[in-house]
Amino acid sequence: MTEAETGTVVERVLVGCTGALQMLSIGDYIAAMRSVGIRRIGVVLSPSAAAMTSPASLEAIVNEVFIELPMTRNHIALSRDYQRLVVVPATANFLASAATGGARNGVELMLIAMPTPSVIVPAMNGAMWAKPAVQRNIATLVEDG
């Protein structure tokens, strides 16, 4: 059953950011989420994403920012506090690790901890996207939910 069918409104989203170039546009993604009624937004940065942005600048537009493992809040508590995880941008490296259940950083850990299906927004060029390994990883993640 979908959220539309149950009438569930998602108001609390945890955004997982990896180190793709599209990380530089994360403010646009956050603004789009706010425009559709997402009221509480937290961000978990992978180490490479944290190197690409100022966590202080993110704190100005979201409710919480998490960088290090162990994070300042327990991953299980976060999985209860937020209704959905949206990984944007998701690198090919993230997809490969996530497809095998990796938990090397906060973003991967949250993907495993969330009790609800997650949304993953891949970010790579067309040649990388077309690789059979990337497509296998996507298929695994879709199957896993």
Model regions: which residues?
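A cross-family phosphate/adenosyl-ligand binding-site feature
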Residues: 1-120, 124-145
